[in-house]
Amino acid sequence: MTDQTRAHINGVRTVGIPVRDQDRALEFYAETLGFEKLMDAPVEQLGGRWIEMSPPGSAITIALTHAREDVAGVDTRIRFTTDDAAALHSQLSASGVDVDELLLWDGIPPMFDFRDPDGNVLYVSEVPSQQV
């Protein structure tokens, strides 16, 4: 097979986040984080539903996948972006979200991490919209 005919991966579409209570997670990601629900369908093979959401205008989605008790609450390594990390940090803190300190280190954009209701760790970095 030559390089010209070789198949390759050309993008990222969806990343999964394991959650114990899909209804609670759906409410958190929609109401607290402002994500849009794109799909919510039962999937017997997964033992729950396929719930797909995204930040407004994003081509990449998250799937809130039903998880066993011992699977949810992981460091997802997922990084979201915002135009204003300090404002979002304050807003999430005021909403009662478990948020760590806002990091303001020389040479890197402001960032912080937080946990969803299942304890999954997620990250936010300040990146102006025109750079995303």
Language-model features, listed with the residues they occupy:
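Core segments of cupin and vicinal oxygen chelate
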Residues: 9-10, 16-59
